[in-house]
UniProtKB/Swiss-Prot annotation:
Protein's job: Ubiquitin-like modifier which can be covalently attached via an isopeptide bond to lysine residues of substrate proteins as a monomer or a lysine-linked polymer. The so-called ufmylation, requires the ufm1-activating E1 enzyme uba5, the ufm1-conjugating E2 enzyme ufc1, and the ufm1-ligase E3 enzyme ufl1. Ufmylation is involved in various processes, such as ribosome recycling, response to DNA damage, transcription or reticulophagy (also called ER-phagy) induced in response to endoplasmic reticulum stress.
Native source species: Osmerus mordax
Record protein name field: Ubiquitin-fold modifier 1
Localization terms from the record: Nucleus; Cytoplasm
InterPro entries: Ubiquitin-like_domsf, UFM1
Gene symbol of the encoding locus: ufm1
Amino acid sequence: MSKVTFKITLTSDPRLPYKVLSVPESTPFTAVLKFAAEEFKVPAATSAIITNDGIGINPAQTAGNVFLKHGSELRIIPRDRVGGRGLYLSP
């Protein structure tokens, strides 16, 4: 069975730490998301993985499909950084 390797960067940390993960192609991408979130100590249930171009990745596919569609360099963002609704106070 072939493996795919991802370099996943935590974008919410100014130091931009990253982890390199190698998983079998058939691994559900939800498992990759969960493992990466645990490695960075962020909540998996409220995190998203995006491409370097900012395109969100649907985790309901295999790691092999994600690798073929989006490549190996990805970013994980915790929910508090996703969509970022700010509070606007009018003067």
